């Protein structure tokens, strides 16, 4: 089957924003203008097409990033048809994993900001993720019709909070109730959208009186930013004082793709203004798969190789999301980087060393689907029939393997015990949790060996709440959940030398003998565990060294204070002895474990607790109450900023253990007028009284 859209006209983009910036509404409008939706879905009434899980429609927030394909010929329908693959990403901080996954497979992103709220904490997280994957992006300032809307304030916030380099290519005509359209700074014309056609039609008009000065000032800034793309353009700009529309577009495109600038637009998705111009900007400034560097990976010998975005190259793709679909079973969303894949053919998974057959290939549109015969370089689609692929793994041609860079996922910070309401559901719950864990790498399931309880762990209270909710809705398993438990860690503060571990058993016949001498010392936070073999002269034979390391690693999950996992410790094997007959791997494993535990006890062990970055937005009247409450939760208030339109933003670092049920108490303290966001920051040593309480509670 021939390619219907040349790859140069593909745009794989994400739409990303803080909660309530109007991202789902923006996506809905895109689907409407590109002709996919004939009735606009509103988030307010729970009918938005992209939010297709029941919980999302109830909560009015987007949880899973649905992938949608649509087509655009430009606002005035004068361009050749471009194909947009849009990934809708969640804005809630408990779902940053979804954002991270989608960033990995996007070529460009559109950041949506609220004209009133501006750049919020979650926006900063998303921005950092986009920087990490070097994703070119545009900014769209939404909700220009709201009271307190201020486009230029958001421009400033992008510079100060995100250290971004925004370049407005439009400026608003009016704001709040009087927002009527935008001035296109390239054409120096006003764009006014026709309300009767829900913004499908528009007209170019003269710039309203009184706006020419502002438009001229921002046009000069835009042309200057374009001129910096090359020496040649800069010279022309210095000589003539201007550049042509095509020169500006091309120069801004070059600099956007290089992540040097971010073109900026504005509008109100809800009132059908501005999204159309943003779609044109996606074509003008964001890259196609061939505009970005070839994807890199490693071959079977761990040598670096790359693949160009070309149908003639060997097939390579990344599985970036798994979903369980009630009708077809497991869907594996893939981004194809090179080559072509037909339904019914086989692919190779180099990470598992396994070959798998693709059953069907589905082109997704939110929650509707269309079966297609093949996918080509640059495509994003869902495959049915893959049994053993998990998120972040590569699929490639059997004859020329490539392993694309694996994604790194954060460790969960909160755990809860969960049990089915009826014993009969035990097995069903196991299957349900297994499926949900396969879909979401930031969610873990394990069985507590001592209590036999099933423990689920995730990125926050809302994350686990939604998992339990999905278990009930999708798998029919009702569960009771225990009190949330914090993921504490243990580490040490002192260096201890010459710690001995000796395991000797003599019970007639062959005995056991292992003897090690260790140095145990703390490492930098986040450095993890390190083992160093410093044995000289074979006092511990070579073949037993791996057993020593294994003994140490097996001891890490259970610390000496309260049985929490041990982190950031370095252990050096310095000396030891062995017995010709009685020494074996098991004896050295036991000796290493005993020595390590003894070393931990002597090296000033401490408990570490997860600290959260908390931001509370509150009316000024309650600022004192909120700060007092955060301090009473052992929080360190780090600053307070003014919010536009009144109110304060309070930033603090608070232990996670003190934040349970915070949303309820914040609501009652501020009569429901304050909101907060929270995300994991780092681990920090728990004060002695807190550590003692944790140890006592664990000992019961």
Curated annotation (Swiss-Prot):
Entry-linked Gene3D superfamilies: 3.30.230.10, 3.30.70.240, Elongation Factor G (Translational Gtpase), domain 3 (3.30.70.870), P-loop containing nucleotide triphosphate hydrolases (3.40.50.300), Translation factors (2.40.30.10)
SUPFAM superfamilies registered for this protein in UniProt: EF-G C-terminal domain-like, P-loop containing nucleoside triphosphate hydrolases, Ribosomal protein S5 domain 2-like, Translation proteins
UniProt binding sites for GTP: 17-24, 88-92, 142-145
Highest taxon listed in the record's lineage: Bacteria
SMART domains hit by this protein: EFG_C, EFG_IV
GO CC annotations on file: cytoplasm
Domain tr-type G, residue spans: 8-290
Gene Ontology biological process: ribosome disassembly
Keyword Magnesium on entry: no
UniProt subcellular location: Cytoplasm
Keyword Protein biosynthesis: yes
Matching Pfam families: EFG_C, EFG_III, EFG_IV, GTP_EFTU, GTP_EFTU_D2
Record-level Gene Ontology MF annotations: GTP binding; GTPase activity; guanosine tetraphosphate binding; translation elongation factor activity
Keyword annotations: Cytoplasm, Elongation factor, GTP-binding, Nucleotide-binding, Protein biosynthesis
PANTHER family: RIBOSOME-RELEASING FACTOR 2, MITOCHONDRIAL, TRANSLATION ELONGATION FACTOR G-RELATED
Family statement: Belongs to the TRAFAC class translation factor GTPase superfamily. Classic translation factor GTPase family. EF-G/EF-2 subfamily.
Function per UniProt: Catalyzes the GTP-dependent ribosomal translocation step during translation elongation. During this step, the ribosome changes from the pre-translocational (PRE) to the post-translocational (POST) state as the newly formed A-site-bound peptidyl-tRNA and P-site-bound deacylated tRNA move to the P and E sites, respectively. Catalyzes the coordinated movement of the two tRNA molecules, the mRNA and conformational changes in the ribosome.
The protein, known as: Elongation factor G
Source organism (scientific name): Leptothrix cholodnii (strain ATCC 51168 / LMG 8142 / SP-6) (Leptothrix discophora (strain SP-6))
């Amino acid at each position: 089957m021939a390619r219907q859209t040349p790859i140069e006209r593909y745009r794989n983009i994400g739409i990303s924003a803080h909660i309530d910036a109007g991202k789902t509404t923006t996506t809905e409008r895109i689907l409407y203008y590109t002709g996919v939706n004939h009735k606009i879905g509103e988030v307010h009434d729970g009918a938005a097409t992209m939010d297709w899980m029941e919980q999302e429609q109830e909560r009015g927030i987007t949880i899973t990033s649905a992938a949608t394909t649509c087509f655009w010929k430009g606002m005035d329908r004068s361009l050749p048809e471009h194909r947009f693959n849009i990934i809708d990403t969640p804005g809630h901080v408990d779902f940053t994993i979804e954002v991270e996954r989608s960033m990995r497979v996007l070529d460009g992103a559109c950041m949506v900001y609220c004209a009133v709220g501006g750049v919020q904490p979650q926006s900063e997280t998303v921005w950092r993720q986009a920087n990490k994957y070097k994703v070119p992006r545009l900014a769209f300032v939404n909700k220009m019709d709201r009271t307190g809307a201020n486009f230029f304030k958001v421009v400033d916030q992008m510079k100060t909070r995100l250290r971004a380099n925004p370049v407005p290519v439009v400026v608003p005509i009016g704001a709040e109730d009087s927002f009527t359209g935008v001035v296109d700074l390239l054409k120096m014309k006003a764009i006014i959208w026709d309300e009767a056609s829900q913004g499908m039609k528009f007209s170019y008009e003269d710039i309203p009186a009184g706006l020419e000065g502002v438009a001229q000032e921002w046009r000069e800034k835009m042309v200057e930013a374009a001129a910096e793309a090359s020496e040649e353009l800069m010279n022309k700009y210095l000589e003539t004082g201007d550049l042509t529309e095509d020169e500006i577009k091309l120069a801004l495109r070059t600099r956007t793709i290089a992540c040097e600038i971010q073109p900026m637009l504005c509008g109100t998705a809800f009132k059908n203004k501005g999204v159309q111009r943003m779609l044109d900007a996606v074509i003008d400034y964001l890259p196609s798969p061939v505009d970005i560097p070839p994807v890199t990976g490693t071959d079977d010998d761990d040598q670096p190789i790359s693949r160009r975005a070309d149908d003639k190259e060997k097939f390579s793709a990344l599985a970036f999301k798994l979903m369980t679909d009630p009708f077809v079973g497991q869907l594996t969303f893939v981004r194809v980087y090179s080559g072509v894949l037909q339904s019914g053919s086989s692919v190779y998974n180099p990470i598992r060393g396994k070959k798998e057959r693709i059953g069907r290939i589905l082109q997704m549109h939110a929650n509707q689907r269309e079966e297609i015969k093949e996918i080509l370089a640059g495509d994003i689609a869902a495959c049915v029939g893959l049994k053993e692929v998990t998120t972040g793994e590569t699929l490639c041609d059997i004859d020329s393997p490539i392993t694309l860079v694996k994604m790194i996922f954060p460790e969960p910070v909160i755990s809860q015990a969960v049990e089915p309401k009826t014993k009969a559901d035990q097995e069903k719950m196991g299957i349900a949790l297994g499926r949900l864990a396969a879909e979401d790498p930031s969610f873990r399931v394990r069985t507590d060996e001592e209590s036999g309880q099933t423990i689920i762990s995730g990125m926050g209270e809302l994350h686990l709440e939604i998992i339990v909710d999905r278990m009930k809705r999708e798998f029919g398993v009702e569960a009771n959940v225990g009190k949330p438990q914090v993921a504490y860690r243990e580490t040490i503060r002192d260096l201890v030398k010459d710690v001995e571990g000796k395991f000797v058993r003599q019970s007639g016949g062959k005995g056991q003998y292992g003897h090690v001498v260790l140095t145990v010392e703390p490492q930098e936070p986040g450095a993890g565990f390190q083992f160093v073999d410093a044995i000289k002269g074979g006092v511990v034979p070579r073949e037993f060294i791996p057993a020593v390391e294994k003994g140490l690693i097996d001891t890490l999950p259970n610390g000496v204070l309260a049985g929490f996992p041990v982190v950031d410790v370095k252990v050096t094997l310095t000396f030891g002895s062995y017995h010709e007959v009685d020494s074996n791997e098991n004896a050295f494993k036991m000796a290493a474990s005993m020595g390590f535990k003894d070393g931990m006890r002597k090296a000033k062990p401490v408990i570490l607790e997860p600290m959260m970055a908390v931001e509370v937005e509150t009316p000024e009247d309650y600022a004192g109450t909120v700060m007092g409450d955060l301090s009473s939760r052992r929080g360190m208030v780090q600053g307070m900023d003014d919010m536009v339109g009144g109110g304060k933003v309070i930033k603090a670092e608070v232990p996670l253990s003190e934040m349970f049920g915070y949303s309820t108490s914040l609501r009652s303290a501020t009569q429901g007028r304050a909101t907060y966001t929270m995300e994991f920051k780092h681990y920090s040593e728990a004060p002695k009284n807190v550590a003692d309480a944790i140890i006592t509670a664990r000992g019961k």
